Each structure stands twice: as C-alpha cells, then as structure tokens.
UniProtKB/Swiss-Prot annotation:
<feature type="modified residue" description="Phosphotyrosine">
    <location>
        <position position="196"/>
    </location>
</feature>
<keyword id="KW-0963">Cytoplasm</keyword>
<feature type="repeat" description="TPR 1">
    <location>
        <begin position="6"/>
        <end position="39"/>
    </location>
</feature>
<keyword id="KW-0472">Membrane</keyword>
<comment type="function">
    <text>Postsynaptic protein required for clustering of nicotinic acetylcholine receptors (nAChRs) at the neuromuscular junction. It may link the receptor to the underlying postsynaptic cytoskeleton, possibly by direct association with actin or spectrin.</text>
</comment>
<dbReference type="GO" id="GO:1900075">
    <property type="term" value="P:positive regulation of neuromuscular synaptic transmission"/>
</dbReference>
<keyword id="KW-1003">Cell membrane</keyword>
<dbReference type="GO" id="GO:0008270">
    <property type="term" value="F:zinc ion binding"/>
</dbReference>
<dbReference type="GO" id="GO:0043495">
    <property type="term" value="F:protein-membrane adaptor activity"/>
</dbReference>
<feature type="repeat" description="TPR 5">
    <location>
        <begin position="206"/>
        <end position="239"/>
    </location>
</feature>
<comment type="similarity">
    <text>Belongs to the RAPsyn family.</text>
</comment>
<keyword id="KW-0770">Synapse</keyword>
<feature type="repeat" description="TPR 7">
    <location>
        <begin position="286"/>
        <end position="319"/>
    </location>
</feature>
<dbReference type="GO" id="GO:0005856">
    <property type="term" value="C:cytoskeleton"/>
</dbReference>
<feature type="repeat" description="TPR 3">
    <location>
        <begin position="123"/>
        <end position="156"/>
    </location>
</feature>
<dbReference type="InterPro" id="IPR011990">
    <property type="entry name" value="TPR-like_helical_dom_sf"/>
</dbReference>
<feature type="lipid moiety-binding region" description="N-myristoyl glycine">
    <location>
        <position position="2"/>
    </location>
</feature>
C-alpha cells in the first residue's frame, strides 16, 4: 500500500470513527498498519489507534501501539515524530497510573526542544505531567505544570487544550478542597465547549459536565450534581467511553452516599469497580474502595470497612498516591476511636500527620492544614498555595514557603 492509498484509508477510518462506527474504523486502520509500506503513514495510523484505544479504555493496547509508534519514529529519524511518540508513551502510562514513567517520558519530550512539533505539543506534555504529579499528590508541581499548560493554550489560542486543562484544574482543587475553584474551572471548560466546540468531539462536553458534577456534590448541591452526571453518562454511553462511564458511576455512588442511601450506592460502586479493574484505573479503584468503606461505616460494619481500607492502602502505596493514604488513615482513626482501640488510633493519627507533612498540606502563613475542609485558596507565582484570607490579611512580601526552603539547615 503506497502513500496515497495509506492516506485515503486513514481518512476513511477517521470518517467511520467520527460517525461512531468504532470497530469498523479499527479494522480499516489495522489493515493499513499491516499493508502500508509508508513509515509516515504508519506513524499516523498508529496515532489514530492510540487515540481510539484511549477513549475505549483499552489502555494496555494503547501502550502497545505507542511502543510500536516510537519504533516507527526512530525509523523515520525525525525529532518531530519522536516528540509525538514520547508524548503518546507518556499518556499511555498516565492512563495506566504509572506516574513516574509518565513524568520521565514527559521530561524526554521537553528536552527535545527546537522541533516544530514540540512547540505545539508542549502544552499537552505539561498537562500530562501535571496529571501524573497530581496522581502522586505532589500538588505544587502539579499546579506548576497545569499553569504552564494553560499559558501554552492561551499563547497558541488552543481552546481544546484550555478545556482539558480547566478540567484537570477542577480535579486539582476538588482534591485540596477549594470547592469554589473546583466548580469554577469545569464551568469555564463548559463555556469553552459552548462557545467554540461545535466541531469538537462530544467527549469535551461530557468531561466538563462530569467535573462539574463532582464539584456540585462536594458543595452539597446534589440535584445539580445528579443532572450534570446524567448528562455526562449519556454521552459516555453513546460513545462507548468506558473510562468516563466508570467515573460517572463512581460519582453517582458518591451522590447516594452523600444522601446516606447506602443500598443505592453499593451497586454503583460495584459497577464502577468492575470497569476500573478491567481498564486498569487503579486511582479510581482507591476512590471506590474509600466510598465503600464509608458505606460500611454508616451501617456500623466496621470490620468490613477495614477490609476495604486495606485493599485501598495496598493500591495507594503501589501507586504512590499520598492523598489516598491520608484519607484512609483518617477513616481508620474514626474506626479505631469508635472501637476504643487506643494504640491503633495513635498509629493512624501519627501516619495521618506524616502524610500532611509530606504533601505540605498546610498554610505557610497560619500553619493550619489545607484540604481538611472547604477553604478558598490562592496560589502565588511559585505555585505554593495558601488560605486566601491569610494572604489578604498578611499581604505578601514573597512566598514564606520559598523563604523557608532557601534557609540552609547549616545557618539555622
């Protein structure tokens, strides 16, 4: 298959894919991959296969194609192809929650400066890197990457990238409990979809609605959360988007948990867990297990709650997800307090505070913790964040956290 025929078949596959005939599109692309003698065409068709498998949640296949794509890029001996290939490797590992590998591949991309593609892709690389740092609960670096990605989006007038970054920022602020910003950013993403997204994939709309649902639930606006989550789920089902279906099921379960309707929450947690296990979303599995533990706690089934927490702990330690560990120590603290087991209670209190220290989840001005309850936060240009009220009260003559870090232990 020559260059022109390869190009024609790739377009045919894209047309099928956009009209929701995914399996037929995959067949066309696989045929191109087998028969095309044109390396640049093979590279492009691998890109299509990577995107399609990502959207279906077939992350292991996505990674497999990304590895073949890197080999094709090396064959082409073109740094532009290599940059794109490494970004796809980074993304595949991000989806499989291999966050250290993601960061490493992203750094490789950023080191390949000077290529024309790198200038277009730097924003996407920064976004993927930010998501990986967030998965590891390294909040300052995550925020730094998201802000960099947002700058690239603004400078290149890339509204799609801006939309994706806004969703990630929504997730970031939901985790550290500034719920006002957790809602603001996905609302901004939804606005971008309305204003510019006529020709975009519907996944952008679905994604922004899902993140709005999460924020509404955390703000206690459960009816609004349900509406947004239903809208997102509808699109996810139409498009066979398994990863998003799993997240929506988790969100539905969390909404029912907020209503203390444990019987309705349980089957939704089970369905979410089943998809997340199938696709390899271990970060999502931790959230499901913590939700299930809370359900058991409501039912006063404390030993069953501890079983769920134990499974979550194994996953969180494996991934290096410190926020997950902090949350489970917090739940254990409540369980052992109820059981009257003082030694275990003390152990988890100590571990809880170790997690807070490690993640630097406290305000450098007042010393109070961040992420314990809903609080308006404000980041300084260095990406350290503080309580907004502390910055307003004390003003800022530079960042107190940066000042502390610059004082060498030898001079203290």
């Amino acid at each position: 298959m020559g260059q022109d025929q390869t190009k024609q078949q790739i377009e045919k596959g894209l047309h099928l894919y956009q009209s929701n005939q995914t399996e037929k599109a995959l067949q066309v692309w696989m045929r191109v991959l087998e028969k095309s003698a044109d390396p640049a065409g093979r590279f492009r068709v691998l890109g299509c296969l990577i995107t399609a498998h990502a959207e279906m949640g077939r992350y292991k296949d996505m990674l497999k194609f990304a590895v073949v794509q890197i080999d094709t890029a090396r064959e082409l001996e073109d740094p532009n192809y290599l940059t794109e290939g490494y970004l796809n490797l980074a993304r595949s590992n991000e989806k499989l929650c291999e966050f250290q590998k993601t960061i490493s591949y992203c750094k490789t991309c950023l080191n390949m400066q000077g290529t024309t593609v790198s200038l277009q892709l730097n924003g996407q690389v920064s976004l993927s890197m930010g998501n990986a740092f967030l998965g590891l609960s390294i909040f300052q670096k995550a925020l730094e990457c998201f802000e960099k990605a947002l700058r690239y989006a603004h400078n290149n007038d890339d509204k799609m990238l801006e939309c994706r970054v806004c969703c990630s920022l929504g997730n970031f602020y939901a985790q550290i409990k500034d719920y006002e910003k957790a809602l603001f950013f996905p609302c901004k993403a939804a606005e971008l979809v309305n204003d510019y997204g006529a020709g975009w994939s519907l996944k952008y709309r679905a994604m922004s609605q899902y993140h709005m649902a999460v924020a509404y639930r955390k703000l206690g606006r459960l009816a609004d959360a349900m509406d947004c989550c239903e809208e997102s789920m509808k699109i996810a089902l139409q498009h066979g988007d398994r990863p998003l279906q799993a997240l929506c099921l988790l969100c539905f379960a969390d909404i029912h948990l907020s209503r203390r309707d444990v019987q309705t929450a349980f089957p939704r947690y089970d369905s979410a867990m089943s998809i997340m296990t199938e696709i390899g979303n271990r970060l999502g599995q931790i959230q499901v297990l913590l939700g299930v533990a809370k359900c058991w706690m409501i039912q006063k089934e404390l030993d069953k709650a501890l079983e769920s927490i134990e499974k979550a702990q194994e996953l969180a330690e494996g991934l290096g997800n410190k926020l997950g560990l902090l949350k489970l120590h917090c739940l254990c603290e409540r369980i052992y307090r109820t059981k009257g087991l003082q030694q275990e209670l003390r152990d988890h209190v100590v571990k809880f505070h170790e997690c807070v220290e490690e993640m630097e989840l406290y305000c450098g001005m007042c010393g109070e913790s961040i992420g314990e309850k809903n609080n308006q936060l404000q980041a300084l240009p260095c990406s350290h964040f503080f309580h907004l009220k502390c910055l307003q009260t004390n003003g800022t003559r530079g960042c107190p956290n940066c000042r502390r870090l610059s004082v060498k232990p030898g001079y203290v």
